[in-house]
A protein has these predicted regions:
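Non-catalytic alpha/beta scaffold blocks inside enzyme catalytic domains
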Residues: 1-172
């Protein structure tokens, strides 16, 4: 990646000559110990090969959770003394957090939540629903109007295709 970024690798020319080149960095690569360096080198490679321009964004980070990009755009980050997901899960496991509200979230290890009271709001019978003390049935994305930010950072709007079944409600 460093050689692509500095232009010494032949693939750098392939990228520079491409009509719409793109780098998509997975969030798993960023979770590594050297994740910040991977992100920096990928950004440098994108800049040096012309992937970032007014009419084209060829540098993207693929998130594992829906609308994470939108949340980041809005500044939804833990402030001073706040906790990220790992900190919340660890706090629940240690008994420092009594209530955990999962909005369609299942990418955490439910076995580590200790005795925290868990409310699950969502539309799948996933791991979060199986661990929950209370389940609030939610509408799927096809059952509600919604706005989200895609991987490229573009705002998109979806229209409801069907009504939610039973007691399911929109998340708000």
């Amino acid at each position: 990646l460093a050689e692509v970024a500095d232009g010494s690798n032949a693939f750098a020319k392939v990228l520079a000559d491409a009509e719409r080149p793109m780098i998509i960095v997975g969030s798993g690569a960023l979770a590594r110990d050297d994740g910040a360096a991977v992100l920096d080198l990928a950004r440098k490679a994108a800049e040096s090969t012309g992937m970032i321009a007014a009419e084209w964004n060829g540098f993207n980070v693929l998130q594992r959770a829906a609308s994470r990009v939108g949340g980041l755009d809005l500044g939804f980050l833990p402030g001073e003394g706040g906790r990220d997901v790992a900190g919340i899960v660890a706090g629940a496991g240690k008994g420092e957090i009594d209530l955990l509200w999962l909005l369609g979230a299942d990418e955490i290890d439910m076995a580590t939540l200790g005795k925290a009271f868990v409310v699950y709001q969502g539309h799948h019978g996933d791991a979060g629903a199986h661990r929950a003390d209370v389940i609030l049935p939610g509408a799927a994305y096809t059952e509600k109007d919604a706005t989200w930010v895609n991987t490229e950072g573009r705002v998109q709007h979806g229209r409801r295709a069907a009504y939610p079944p039973g007691d399911a409600r929109e998340d708000w």
